[in-house]
């Protein structure tokens, strides 16, 4: 697209946080025709009965007025419920630990929002994510953000060529302290606002309380693989593989961890020791594969992978089983690989794509107890 910046309309998703505020400021300073959109994805009130979305939208209004750009609020609650929240509940019901942020980016921020932006005459959408897009060798590549500590390509792993061709990440070359400083210098209302944490629709609330509103808890037995009962669990959906806190097992010796789930018998398996071999897998079957590139993949190739956000890169060999499934062979056993989570593939700074962890093996044996 050879338009000049002032002829190029960029619709930016604004959350009311400092990152998207500075991203909007940068686009405006670069001369683009910028429109701010606040996405209302969840009908939400906090413990005090305050609608947090209203507070966030008020921050968006204030920042947009400061920058001098128009703004709108768009309601995506139905799409979010259908595409993200239903998936979230289904995964927990199946005893897995989902990653709703990946699905939200795929289905809402870079699909429903992108379609809405194009209807507004947008040439591009932008967000405050820490990632980069580059056009090289005839296609779009997604690269890690320069700030290693904040890089968000893990959550963006399902984006396609079509989506990336319409996307700008203004913060990709910056580090978080620089962004805070820019917000402060510009006097933005969100300059000192703390970063949001946790799953977007739960916010700061207690996860267990939230989930119990939608899924009936089924308490059961907590035991070792040899059958020694160590207590009761509150419901398998509340525990993730490798979890230490909340088990309530006293006594001396090494701490206890959740090492597996038996859905049929509603048993939570536990064992002692952070480095317990029951927590380590060296082979993974992953499904719902999405590649950033449209180029045909080799049947087998080496790269690195992250099995959770902020994990170090692990050397792996990826084998293509079919267009929806890959087998991942790890050079070294990896702790607490969790079904339902995303595995994301990298070649240096380039994010190649990702998939959903489905089955975990150790030395050729499926870890059935992972549920």
Curated annotation (Swiss-Prot):
Pfam families (alphabetical): tRNA_Me_trans, tRNA_Me_trans_C, tRNA_Me_trans_M
Site Interaction with tRNA: list residues.
129, 341
Q: Name one GO cellular component term.
A: cytoplasm
Query: Sorted alphabetically, which keywords does the UniProt record give?
Result: ATP-binding, Cytoplasm, Disulfide bond, Nucleotide-binding, RNA-binding, Transferase, tRNA processing, tRNA-binding
EC identifiers of the protein: 2.8.1.13
Location within or outside the cell: Cytoplasm
Which GO BP terms, alphabetically? tRNA wobble position uridine thiolation
The UniProt GO MF terms for this protein read:
ATP binding; tRNA binding; tRNA-uridine 2-sulfurtransferase activity
Residues annotated as the enzyme's active site: 104 (nucleophile), 200 (cysteine persulfide intermediate)
Annotated region described as Interaction with target base in tRNA, given as residue ranges: 99-101
Stored InterPro entries: MnmA-like, MnmA-like_C, MnmA-like_central, MnmA-like_central_sf, Rossmann-like_a/b/a_fold
Which annotated residues bind ATP? 13-20, 39, 128
Which cysteine pairs are covalently linked by disulfides here? Answer: 104-200
Its UniProt entry gives the catalysed reaction(s) as: S-sulfanyl-L-cysteinyl-[protein] + uridine(34) in tRNA + AH2 + ATP = 2-thiouridine(34) in tRNA + L-cysteinyl-[protein] + A + AMP + diphosphate + H(+)
Q: Which HAMAP family match?
A: tRNA_thiouridyl_MnmA
Q: Which family does the record claim for this protein? A: Belongs to the MnmA/TRMU family.
What does this protein do, in the record's words? Catalyzes the 2-thiolation of uridine at the wobble position (U34) of tRNA, leading to the formation of s(2)U34.
Official protein name in the record: tRNA-specific 2-thiouridylase MnmA
User: From which source organism is this entry?
Assistant: Bacillus anthracis
């Amino acid at each position: 697209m050879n338009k000049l910046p002032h002829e190029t309309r960029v619709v930016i998703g604004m959350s009311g946080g400092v990152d998207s505020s500075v991203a909007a400021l940068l686009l405006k300073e670069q001369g683009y025709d910028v429109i701010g959109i606040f996405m209302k994805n969840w009908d939400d009130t906090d413990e005090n009965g305050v609608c947090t979305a209203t507070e966030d939208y008020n921050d968006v209004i204030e920042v947009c007025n400061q920058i001098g750009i128009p703004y709108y609020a768009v309601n995506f609650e139905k799409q979010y419920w259908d595409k993200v929240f239903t998936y979230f509940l289904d995964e927990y019901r199946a005893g897995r630990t989902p990653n709703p942020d990946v699905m939200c980016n795929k289905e809402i921020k870079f699909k429903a929002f992108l379609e809405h932006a194009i209807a507004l005459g947008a040439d591009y959408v932008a967000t405050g994510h820490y990632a980069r897009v580059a056009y090289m060798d005839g296609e779009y590549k997604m690269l890690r953000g320069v700030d290693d500590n904040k890089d968000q390509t893990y959550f963006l792993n399902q984006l396609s060529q079509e989506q990336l061709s319409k996307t700008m990440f203004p913060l990709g070359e910056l580090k978080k302290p620089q962004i805070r400083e820019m917000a402060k210098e510009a006097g933005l209302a969100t300059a000192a606002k703390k970063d949001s944490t946790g799953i977007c629709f739960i916010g700061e609330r207690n996860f267990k309380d939230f989930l119990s509103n939608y899924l009936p808890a089924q308490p059961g037995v907590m035991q070792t693989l040899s059958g020694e009962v160590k207590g009761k669990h509150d419901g398998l959906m509340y525990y993730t593989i490798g979890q230490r806190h909340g088990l309530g097992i006293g006594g001396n010796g090494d701490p206890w961890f959740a090492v597996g789930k038996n859905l049929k018998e509603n048993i939570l398996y536990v064992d002692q020791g952070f480095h317990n071999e029951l927590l380590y897998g060296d082979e993974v079957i992953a499904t719902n594969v999405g590649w950033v590139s449209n180029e045909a993949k080799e049947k087998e190739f080496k790269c690195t992978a992250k099995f959770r956000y902020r994990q170090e890169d692990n050397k792996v060999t990826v084998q293509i089983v079919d267009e929806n499934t890959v087998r991942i062979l790890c050079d070294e056993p990896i702790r607490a690989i969790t079904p339902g989570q995303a595995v994301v593939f990298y070649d240096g700074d380039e994010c190649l794509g990702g998939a959903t962890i489905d089955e975990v093996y150790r030395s050729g044996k499926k870890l059935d107890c992972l549920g």
